[in-house]
A protein has these predicted regions:
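A short beta-strand motif characteristic of beta-propeller blades
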Residues: 461-487, 523-528, 570-589, 625-633, ...
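Residue position within the beta-strands of beta-propeller blades
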Residues: 446, 506, 548-549, 608, ...
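Blade-level signature of beta-propeller repeat domains, shared across WD40, Kelch, NHL, RCC1
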Residues: 794-837
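N-terminal signal peptide
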Residues: 10-29, 837
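Structural motif
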Residues: 450-458, 512-516, 555-565, 613-618, ...
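Short coil/turn segments that connect the beta-strands within blades of beta-propeller domains
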Residues: 440-442, 501-502, 542-544, 603-605, ...
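Immunoglobulin-superfamily
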Residues: 48, 77-79, 94, 131-186, ...
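Repeated scaffold domains used in trafficking and secretory/extracellular systems
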Residues: 433-437, 473-497, 532-543, 581-599, ...
Length: 837
């Protein structure tokens, strides 16, 4: 019956794979074991002595016949005298009935105790407890797991017949069957508990010791007696051998949880079962438990996932499962609601009787808010008429032929499940008292060869021309000093940024400086020295800093990053270097900082792109220091461009062409875990994301494609629809739709042709605005890949501007047509929109 047990246990008690793990701290008291028979070690040993005496001394056999030596000793014939003497036994018969001696040592049987007492020449008694069984136990975790694995393998061979090798084809069922059978074999008295006596009995019956392994059956009791009661119950056997029966109710396999941004939330895993292993949580197939995340940092004793401060980046799908049992999992769809944030335009306006007035309202939130209007606190809906209408899904109040009684405070109210917001747009109807319309004064600033032009887009009028020779306010420096060898004083500009509609920062790469233009006075007020050849500026609104990328030389041999802090302040400005200098940032080829939006007002992190390196360096914008490296080497992607959506917190990485000219697909990076999730399907090219985060537009010059993907309020990225074009898109601008609330249109300028592409993103409708003259050649604009910029005019802006080689074109976005051309503006490829200051 025990033949198979003998085979495996003699091989060293190799145990099966399990999570039961020996630890030095694990100590368990064991119940007393009373031996059934008290052995005297006399008959066989004395017979051996008589034989030995006969062989050595050649004397009479009966010399030791009547000599009784006691336990642990035997009779021998002295070589000198030939007389029978008692000596310590050379060895005991091999059988395994372990006991503890009063000296604290472990002995394989009673005979060994008495033999040791003889050799040590002091009395050793048998102590009736098993504490010494584990003294000097060297059973390691790996050996213990192997031993248990082999026990299961043996049980499988022993009890599962050839006709039924794989009962039900279910590994969990088969393992449970084997462990049940093993437990029944060990539980000799059928009381539902296995104690040390029964373990000893198994070892004794199989004549197994500890000769071939450092692990024995006693280690089951030592390491897997979870309640420390000195017995092994069937449930403890199940835990020991990882036989776990888990359940997940069918109606809980998919759970939907909704929280409001800024709150904390708990996702609880509904997987149940006795001895359930620890719960593992995944997001986008990335295990969260060991990542030490800032906002997801406490998984609780019950395996729940805690998000301490919910943001829109946390939305998406989460899965939970018991460790080692991935086949049973629960999916949590986590939705994040955001209360509405509202803006109205204009805040105030004056109109003469008989003209048309328009009051517009833009609201964002999750889910999309519903809009309503009040006039002086009363709902205007009952008063709607041909003269007073609501347009664009209620986002615009249109009043034709205004009358004095139309004067009032018009309140736009936005509501969704998370909250409500409102704002007031005031209309004054009065006789020619104010010729200038309140709130109107928005301008394009164009930086070109002959200085700076400030242009009002409606009538295409120049409001100001700052000449190259004009002096900085309060200084002797000129806006564009005449360069040595130049016959004509001219300006060279790279990029420019708007800082809170108060200042414009603009880079002068050939002068190693950044100029500050004061919007209120429309004068240049300061020059900030930078590292050589500053080419790219970005305004980080969250921290009020302007980031400056300088090349060092035109060959980009020593690029650096600098920061101008307190950018909107009135004090004199200066640059500071990012840290650490000379390590992470000194090879910067480009950088990316997400743009703040109506809903997302704080941006914490940005990225540095290094030339020809398949990595992203993450930086903390608050400390301006390196955080970590995200490796893209497995995807063979050298990053060239990035875009970001707060809906699910995804970065889209556009990759450079490889050595064969092939462009790898875009990569997706999860901002919650900083993990690369894989490719964005087969979408390639430069990514752009709409201000509301809902549209991803990818421009693939190689394939001649514009690909549009919609991102849902759950952060799901939908399949792309394609627009084929040979325009070679240079730059892209988003403009809110004038006919549909919560929708956007795009305008794309061409780097080689004279047309601008218009796409209505919701419908896919495409139109071309033609005959806008040729752009600058790429070699005439070395500062970036956008040799023909296109600039929108803000949240409520109707106009866009795009330069050609020597003209400016202002487009009417509401009518989708050319508004006007302004000629004799050469190299005007740096354009900034400034709204109401």
């Amino acid at each position: 019956m025990f033949k198979c047990w003998s085979a495996v246990l003699i091989l060293g008690f190799i145990f099966l794979e399990s999570e039961g793990r020996p630890t030095k701290e694990a100590g368990y008291g064991l119940k007393s074991y009373q031996p059934l028979i008290r052995l005297r070690h006399k008959e066989k040993s004395q017979e051996r002595s008589r034989i030995k005496g006969f062989l050595i001394q050649d004397g009479p056999l009966r010399s030791c016949e009547n000599k009784y030596c006691g336990l642990g000793r035997h009779c021998v014939l002295s070589r000198e005298t030939g007389q029978a003497e008692c000596a310590c036994m050379d060895l005991c018969n091999r059988h395994y009935k372990p006991v503890c001696g009063s000296d604290g040592e472990f002995y394989e049987n009673h005979c060994e105790v008495h033999r040791a007492a003889c050799l040590k020449k002091h009395k050793i008694t048998i102590v009736h407890n098993e504490d010494c069984f584990f003294k000097g136990d060297n059973c390691e975790a790996t050996e213990y797991s192997k031993m248990k694995s082999m026990l299961l393998d043996l049980q499988n061979q022993k009890y599962v017949t050839q006709d039924n090798e794989n009962p039900n084809g279910d590994d969990v069922f088969r393992k449970k069957l084997l462990v049940d059978q093993m437990f029944n074999y060990f539980d000799a008295d059928r009381n539902g508990l296995v104690d040390i006596n029964e373990l000893t009995q198994v070892i004794k019956q199989e004549e197994l010791g500890k000769d071939l392994s450092d692990c024995t059956l006693y280690d089951l009791l030592k390491y897997d007696d979870f309640n420390s009661d000195k017995h092994l119950a069937l449930e403890e056997f199940y835990r020991t051998f990882q036989v776990i029966q888990l359940s997940l109710p069918e109606d809980q396999k998919l759970s939907i949880t909704t929280a409001t941004v800024g709150q904390s939330t708990v996702l609880s895993c509904a997987i149940q079962g006795e001895l359930r292993p620890p719960i593992i949580w995944k997001r986008n197939n990335i295990i969260l438990n060991n990542l030490d995340l800032e906002d997801i940092n406490d998984f609780g004793d019950d395996g729940s996932l805690y998000i301490t401060k919910v943001t829109t980046t946390h939305m998406g799908n989460y899965t939970c499962y018991a460790e080692g049992y991935e086949d049973i999992y629960q999916t949590h769809i986590f939705q994040v609601n955001v209360p509405p944030v509202i803006r109205v335009y204009p805040e105030s306006q004056a109109r003469e009787p008989g003209v048309t007035a328009s009051l517009r309202c833009h609201a964002e939130g999750i889910p999309n808010p519903q809009l309503g209007w009040l006039k002086n606190g009363i709902d205007i809906t009952p008063k709607l008429s041909k003269q007073l209408t609501l347009q664009a899904n209620g986002s615009e109040v249109h009043i034709s032929n205004v009358r004095y009684e139309d004067t009032g405070a018009y309140t736009c109210i936005a509501k969704n499940e998370a909250g409500v917001d409102e704002d007031i747009s005031s209309l004054f109807v009065e006789d020619s008292a104010r010729k200038t319309r309140l709130g109107i004064g928005n301008m394009f600033y164009v930086f070109y060869e002959d200085g700076i032009k400030v242009i009002q887009p409606i009538e295409c009028e120049f409001q100001r021309h700052i000449k190259p020779s004009e002096k900085l306010l309060g200084f002797q420096d000129e806006v564009c000093p005449k360069a040595e060898g130049d016959e004509v004083q001219r300006c060279v500009w790279a990029t420019a940024v708007n800082v809170k509609d108060k200042f414009i920062y603009v880079a002068q790469p050939t002068l190693d400086r950044v100029l500050l233009v004061d919007v209120q006075s429309q004068k240049v007020i300061q020059a900030v020295s930078t590292d050589p050849v500053p080419v790219k500026l970005h305004y980080d609104k969250s921290h009020d800093q302007v980031w400056v990328l300088s090349w060092g030389t035109m060959e980009k041999t020593s690029p650096t990053l600098q920061v101008i802090t307190l950018a909107s302040g009135d004090a004199p400005h200066h640059t500071i270097h990012t840290q650490p200098v000379g390590k992470q940032f000194d090879r910067a080829d480009d950088f990316f900082i997400p743009t703040a939006s109506l809903l997302i007002t704080h941006v914490r992190f940005g990225f540095i792109l290094h030339k020809d390196e398949a990595v992203l360096q993450k930086i903390d914008l608050e400390t301006m220091s390196y955080v970590k490296t995200i490796n893209l080497k497995d995807y063979k992607c050298v990053p060239q461009s990035l875009a970001y959506t707060h809906l699910g917190g995804y970065y889209f990485i556009g990759c450079k062409p490889n050595s064969t000219g092939e462009v790898p697909p875009q990569l997706l990076v999860d901002s919650v875990t900083d993990s690369v999730l894989g490719f964005n399907s087969d979408v390639t090219g430069t990514p752009y994301v709409s201000p509301d985060g809902h549209y991803l537009v990818s421009i693939s010059d190689v394939k001649g494609l514009v690909r549009v993907q919609y991102i849902t309020i759950r952060g799901e990225i939908q399949e792309a629809f394609d627009i084929h074009t040979n325009l070679h898109i240079s730059d892209l601008a988003f403009q809110p739709s004038f006919t549909e609330a919560h929708q956007y249109n795009i305008y794309g300028s061409s780097s080689t042709q004279t047309d601008v592409l218009f796409v209505e993103l919701a419908s896919g409708k495409v139109k071309m605005i033609k005959s806008l003259k040729e752009p600058l050649k790429a070699e005439e604009w070395p500062w970036n890949r956008k040799n023909r910029q296109i600039q929108d005019s803000g949240l409520f802006g109707q106009y866009l501007m795009t330069p050609s080689k020597d003209s400016l074109f202002i487009l009417d976005g509401r009518l989708n047509k050319l508004n006007c051309e302004i000629t004799e503006v050469e190299q005007g490829n740096t354009v900034v929109w400034v709204g109401d200051a």
